[in-house]
């Protein structure tokens, strides 16, 4: 089922920055926010508990990638945090992903990172020695994530249709690299607008800088939400 709220990437260096950002929103506006590695490693689980206490939904994007037993143990802890979604890296393999899903169960959605939206085909070939197209690599990772029992993948909106055709219509596609029309793409190389992501079948979109760096984050959020639901 498609999530109507854009997920806001809280890419901040400090707790105080997040608190200041949230002051732009009414207290009764329950957000869906993403906590990434930088923020989680700087603050720790306290930030998750704080945001859950305010009633917000949490996407914990840690991209776990290690041997199956280690990821299983880590996921057993993360599953106690009350999070709504969490990531592992598909490159860790089917066994690793499967072990993570077994221990997490239905406590949260488990999605796999395929290829980062900052990865170009040249990067993939030179650094990863994967001699296929980005789309072929992403679809292969998606199939493996589905095989492992995961709920979906993180992918560019440009790969959504291919992934759903290769897996299932209800296999979730979480798409970062979303930019409103006319905004700068930054370090993202595979981007789409919120409306385009909706039309192509994305289930969740993740938006960072266009909201958190906006002069008025509340207005920016609602404009992106309107585009996403149009």
Swiss-Prot record:
Query: Could you name the Gene Ontology cellular component terms for this entry?
Result: cytosol
Instruction: Please tell me whether the keyword Transcription regulation is annotated for this protein.
Output: no
Q: From the UniProt record, which GO molecular function terms apply? A: orotidine-5'-phosphate decarboxylase activity
User: Which biological pathway?
Assistant: Pyrimidine metabolism; UMP biosynthesis via de novo pathway; UMP from orotate: step 2/2
Gene Ontology process terms (BP)? 'de novo' pyrimidine nucleobase biosynthetic process; 'de novo' UMP biosynthetic process
Q: What is its EC number?
A: 4.1.1.23
UniProt binding sites for substrate? 11, 34, 61-70, 117, 179, 188, 208-209
The protein's matches in PROSITE patterns, at most eight in alphabetical order, are given as: OMPDECASE
Q: What is this protein called?
A: Orotidine 5'-phosphate decarboxylase
Write down the species.
Streptococcus gordonii (strain Challis / ATCC 35105 / BCRC 15272 / CH1 / DL1 / V288)
């Amino acid at each position: 089922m498609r999530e109507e709220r854009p997920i806001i990437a809280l890419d901040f260096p400090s707790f105080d920055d997040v608190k200041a950002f949230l002051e732009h929103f009414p207290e009764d506006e329950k957000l869906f926010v993403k906590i990434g590695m930088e923020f989680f490693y700087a603050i720790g689980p306290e930030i998750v508990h704080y945001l859950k206490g305010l009633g917000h939904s949490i996407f914990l994007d840690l991209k776990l990638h290690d041997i199956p037993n280690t990821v299983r143990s880590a996921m057993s802890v993360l599953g106690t945090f009350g999070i709504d979604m969490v990531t592992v890296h598909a490159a860790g393999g089917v066994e690793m992903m499967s072990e993570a899903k077994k221990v997490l169960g239905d406590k949260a959605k488990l999605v796999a990172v395929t290829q980062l939206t900052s990865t170009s085909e040249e990067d993939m070939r030179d650094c990863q020695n994967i001699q296929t197209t980005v789309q072929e690599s992403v679809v292969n990772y998606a199939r493996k994530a589905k095989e492992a029992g995961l709920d979906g993948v993180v992918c560019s909106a440009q790969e959504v249709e291919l992934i759903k055709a290769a897996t299932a219509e209800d296999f979730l596609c979480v798409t970062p690299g979303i930019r409103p029309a006319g905004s700068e793409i930054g370090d993202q190389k595979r981007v789409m607008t919120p409306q385009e992501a909706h039309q192509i079948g994305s289930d969740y979109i993740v938006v960072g800088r266009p909201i958190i760096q906006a002069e008025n984050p509340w207005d920016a959020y609602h404009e992106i939400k309107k585009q996403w639901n149009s």
